[in-house]
Curated annotation (Swiss-Prot):
One of its GO terms (molecular function) is structural constituent of ribosome. It comes from Sulfurihydrogenibium sp. (strain YO3AOP1). This is Large ribosomal subunit protein uL3. It holds the Pfam family Ribosomal_L3. PANTHER family: 50S RIBOSOMAL PROTEIN L3, LARGE RIBOSOMAL SUBUNIT PROTEIN UL3C. One of the primary rRNA binding proteins, it binds directly near the 3'-end of the 23S rRNA, where it nucleates assembly of the 50S subunit. Keywords: Ribonucleoprotein, Ribosomal protein, RNA-binding, rRNA-binding.
Length: 226
């Protein structure tokens, strides 16, 4: 089985576990279908490409459409490769469901596109404090000084200034799987997830699960939810 799956963010709610309210994000994860596989002998690595969603055939590039037809699956909106778990194999056209990949108490890393906020000031983009709110000046939300004089005679790269904010790829590490509802292809993840409702997200086995703090968090999560 793959080490990840593709899903769609539905929204947020809360569930009660042992009398404690847990804020969770609801994600419709799968069902996904295998488009093709990569092997160590032929490609140099082991992976599987999963598809999610639907798309009109007329809007699909012909090379990609040929992949879907070869696997005997419907044209999909999203296609992405995931590494395979050790010693496991899948076949093109095979259905992958959320319960095949994750279980309660697992730690997952979730990648998505953050909400786009357009051109914003430094107070919103970088959390600047701004100037005093008293009267007598007009610089309440201004950026302030952006450099020196003759030396260096320019604005340093990476200087925090106003500009485009959001609409970036963001990954949140080590989120806990609170519950899985197989009959609805739904997974409940503790905390917030990047992106707007109905946006595509990618769920993967967490990279922090093998670290010391990650192992402690995983054991605590398993004891609470599993």
């Amino acid at each position: 089985m793959p080490k990840g799956i593709i899903g769609k963010k539905i929204g947020m709610t809360k569930v009660f576990v042992n009398g404690k309210a847990i804020p969770v994000t609801v994600i419709q994860a799968g069902p996904c279908y295998v488009a093709y596989t990569r092997t160590q002998e032929k490609d140099g690595y082991n992976a599987v490409a999963l598809t999610f969603g639907e798309r009109k055939e007329k809007n699909i590039p012909k090379p990609l459409l040929a992949i879907f037809k070869k696997a005997n699956i419907k044209p999909a909106k999203v296609i992405k490769e995931f590494p395979l778990k050790d010693g496991e194999t899948v076949e093109p056209g095979q259905e992958i469901r959320i319960e095949n990949v994750f279980e309660k108490g697992d730690l997952v890393d979730i990648t998505g596109k953050s909400k786009g906020r357009g051109f914003t000031s430094v107070m919103k983009r970088w959390d600047f404090a701004g100037f005093p709110k008293s009267h007598g000046h007009r610089y309440h939300r201004a950026v302030g000084s952006i450099g020196c004089r003759t030396e260096p005679g320019r604005v340093w790269k990476t200087k925090r200034m106003a500009g485009h904010y959001g609409n970036e790829t963001v990954t949140v590490l080590g989120l806990e799987v609170v519950d899985i509802i197989p009959e609805k292809n739904v997974i409940l993840v503790k905390g917030s997830v990047p992106g707007a409702p109905n946006s595509t997200v990618f769920l993967k086995q967490s990279v922090i699960a093998d670290r010391r703090k990650g192992k402690l968090k995983l054991a605590k999560s398993k004891a609470m939810y599993a």
